Amino acid sequence: MFITNDIRYVGVNDHEIDLFEGQYVVPAGMAYNSYLILDRKTALFDSVDIRFRDEWLNNISSELNGRKVDYFIIQHMEPDHSSSIVEFMKANPDTVIVGNAKTFAMLDQFFEDVPANVRQTVKAGDTLELGTHVLNFVFAPMVHWPEVMMTYDSTDKVLFSADAFGKFGANDVEDPEGWACEAARYYIGIVGKYGTQVQNVLKKAAALDIKTICALHGPVLTGDLNTYLDLYNKWSSYEPDKNGVAIAYTSVYGHTKAAALSLAEQLKAKGVKIEVFDLARDDMAEAVEAAFRFDRLVLATTTYNADIFPFMRHFVEHLTERNFQKRRVAIIENGSWAPTAKKVILGLLEGCKDLTIAENCVTIKSALNAETRETLAKLAEEFAC
């Protein structure tokens, strides 16, 4: 596939995978992207998951038309992008591997048989001339691994962005919801903890004239790139994407669920955009993404072993691990003799910045009654705007 006259796509699609990184459900599969520049010298960007090594090598060969790969640029050492390196080098022993010092440290951790005499170490700001194409190396540490770097082709104005601007889903599957939905779930799940580091990279990118973004997952981005850059700026600064309420609940016998659904119906009747998640059954990553997407969050859970229900603890820890902040939060707790869920949740959220806790949090003892229904109605009023 042509990206520009000299840049070709040589990646693969994975429809065998069910869980990406062992935890994220990917019903539309995944893409492992790899790119090739054909100039006086040739440059290959990143490899693919080892299960698709042969397909990838065939893709490269068909584009080279008998030429060799001069440079193999390693932007990210995570195995879905690096596990085919050794097999490539066995077939191409004269290719120079380009990476930074941390790249090669990780290379030696993963593999024992990549020779040292074919390595070229680059530093931030270094350039590599291929002929008419000049590559500039932009370091992006902790987006989302420490060795990550991006590469800017100043000739075709293409940013090879590593995992940044990636999304879930194979590239041969039409996404009816567009780029942003699965890109948000991908960003928040995988990169979300590192907002400060993403902000630093966005500042570097602002100084570049970028016409195309080539990420390691998802489609090649062209056209009005401000759409994607603005969303990344919003996500990495932890600003809500939309006005609305995410309601996440756990329930043992249905009483806490009844309260959560009652609140949802009241908010819906007031014209509020809502999404409701049963944390024991629904996709946890979808619930986490919704908590970051909306400006309001309701946590409804039972007291369990003097703590909170395990799925709720898991959910809240997902939020805090990703620096959850700048939101309004309400709590609905339930406990038949000693409801302590609110206290536990507030303790878990203690380190989060700029959270506003609702005035009308609800404490249920066993089941809703007239008094708690009234408090629930007050919470609906409070969270309606």
Regions of interest found by a model, annotated:
Residues F2-I60, M150-D153, K157-S161, T256:
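Conserved beta-strand hairpin/beta-sheet module of binuclear metal-dependent hydrolase folds
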Residues F2-N5, G99-V148, Y194-N200:
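Metallo-beta-lactamase
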Residues L36, M150-C214, T222-Y249:
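Metal-dependent phosphodiesterase/nuclease catalytic metal-binding core
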Residues R40, R51-V98:
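Active-site metal-binding motif and surrounding structural segment of the metallo-beta-lactamase
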Residues F45-S47, V69-M77, I97-N100, L159-A162, ...:
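Active-site neighborhood of phospho(di)ester-bond hydrolases with catalytic His/Asp-centered motifs
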Residues S84, D283-A287:
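Short acidic active-site motifs
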Residues N171-I213, H217-V220, S262-F277, A287-C385:
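FMN-binding flavodoxin-like domain, especially the glycine-rich phosphate-binding loop
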Residues A248-K270:
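Short, charged N-terminal beta->alpha structural module
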